[in-house]
UniProtKB/Swiss-Prot annotation:
Catalytic residues (positions): 337 (proton donor)
Major location (coarse): membrane
Enzyme class: hydrolase
Pfam entry (one): Glyco_hydro_20
Function: Has a broad substrate specificity. Can use synthetic substrates such as p-nitrophenyl-beta-N-acetylglucosaminide, p-nitrophenyl-2-acetamido-2-deoxy-beta-D-glucopyranoside (pNP-GlcNAc), p-nitrophenyl-2-acetamido-2-deoxy-beta-D-galactopyranoside (pNP-GalNAc), 4-methylumbelliferyl-2-acetamido-2-deoxy-beta-D-glucopyranoside (MU-GlcNAc), and 4-methylumbelliferyl-6-sulfo-2-acetamido-2-deoxy-beta-D-glucopyranoside (MU-GlcNAc-6SO(4)) as substrates. Removes terminal GlcNAc residues from alpha1,3- and alpha1,6-mannosyl branches of biantennary N-glycans without any strict branch preference.
Reactions catalysed according to its record: Hydrolysis of terminal non-reducing N-acetyl-D-hexosamine residues in N-acetyl-beta-D-hexosaminides
Activity regulation: Inhibited by N-acetylcastanospermine.
Protein name, per record: Beta-hexosaminidase 2
Gene Ontology molecular function terms on file: beta-N-acetylhexosaminidase activity; hexosaminidase activity; UDP-glucosyltransferase activity
UniProt record similarity statement: Belongs to the glycosyl hydrolase 20 family.
Record keywords, A-Z: Cell membrane, Disulfide bond, Glycoprotein, Glycosidase, Hydrolase, Membrane, Signal
Cell location: Cell membrane
Naturally occurring in which organism (per UniProt): Arabidopsis thaliana
Amino acid sequence: MLTLSKFHVILIPILFFITLLSPLFSIALPINIWPKPRFLSWPQHKAIALSPNFTILAPEHQYLSASVTRYHNLIRSENYSPLISYPVKLMKRYTLRNLVVTVTDFSLPLHHGVDESYKLSIPIGSFSAHLLAHSAWGAMRGLETFSQMIWGTSPDLCLPVGIYIQDSPLFGHRGVLLDTSRNYYGVDDIMRTIKAMSANKLNVFHWHITDSQSFPLVLPSEPSLAAKGSLGPDMVYTPEDVSKIVQYGFEHGVRVLPEIDTPGHTGSWGEAYPEIVTCANMFWWPAGKSWEERLASEPGTGQLNPLSPKTYEVVKNVIQDIVNQFPESFFHGGGDEVIPGCWKTDPAINSFLSSGGTLSQLLEKYINSTLPYIVSQNRTVVYWEDVLLDAQIKADPSVLPKEHTILQTWNNGPENTKRIVAAGYRVIVSSSEFYYLDCGHGGFLGNDSIYDQKESGGGSWCAPFKTWQSIYNYDIADGLLNEEERKLVLGGEVALWSEQADSTVLDSRLWPRASALAESLWSGNRDERGVKRCGEAVDRLNLWRYRMVKRGIGAEPIQPLWCLKNPGMCNTVHGALQDQ
């Protein structure tokens, strides 16, 4: 137990550069909160013990109450011991008995743009800390911050006192995409990912559920899609699984955004409905054909036939089931990589083209037949950028109403973001040059001669590997010159495509690289002078990575442990903590 005089010097973790009194003045202080808050003041550098009877006092709420219970248990059980210790004055006169949570508007739903701001204060001389938020979701962000300020072994827990934090995100959409079609992930894997996202203040789990390789989602109105299109009967997601994941997301302040990729990437639909899928189960790149004549961009062929009335009967059933199972207000309809060669294998489509029709008109017909139906279900439609920007098959903007359509980038870095914004569309940034977490792991084709080429990137089309530094330093609104353009950038997502990933590598592929995205989209990647702070962030991210591991997240290391125990010794210039 703690036996102290008026003040007692104890040891707490290094290293957090906080804003002290003024956002223009920073000094090194031993608090590590990830992502870094927008404003933090701790002028007296004092700490107090947490009462053995500490409680969190919060109003009852369907989702916040579960969060309060979770954080109370975490605070008592985490037993976080700092890897590096620095002295701080611990006050003896009293202990912190409770955290009082106040939410001004519990009616605010978990959707894009909801207020996630919070204010957190632990006054000197008070038995209570205070957390004020406009929404339940902002309160959850504040609870996470509070949990990260606590260290010690229960019941001897400590935290800073005389501290004030005012915090809110720069971008409303901060997400992780996980592809569960190419390889299957268990429900526990998905829930663990959502838990880690919440700890990093990420708020959108983009669930790329289906693709050509499998259709793992059991739908009440179309059960044959999963029965015949999944990778196996034990590799499906039932309605009960979906309900559990969605509920878990709400309890962690994470939206679950479903993606049913169409009309491309639908080979798995052909197992149940071969009559609505063109080029299903054909070899993806026929012998003697050029790349332009391929049937798919990777193994797993199949695209929905826009000329078949049966297509829309099935698709609308799928949409209705998705709307019923997912309360999320965004519906991701895919729309990427519609390949000309696949559609051209169908006689009816060839007849349409011979009569003067175009492939782009086929895409427009599909969108015109599905987008209004999605909108009628009170959903905003998200498509990949291809529907507007593809060089061969794209839709006229007239069929993509800006008030109902959001586009997600994945090519050409900031250039495609600029093009989408210039066209007046809202955009979610997932540039493969920066945010694709599968890149740099080689290829998966069995006999690709590119592996023998010295400058091939090891067979990975999007090599090199996207480091946490690359992710952290990327400015998603780069080159947008005015505030109106920047407002159209909703945020960003890192993407884990699963050609070479499954549950065995899930945590290490995501973390802590997704943590780098989390801070850059929450509080930015620059210091108060406008200088990139990647160099300063490395120690903080390293500490956060170790804490995530203690919380059960298998985040990969970013440095030798020796570097963390010897601050500054692994820099390129001794004592240099800022990027120039």
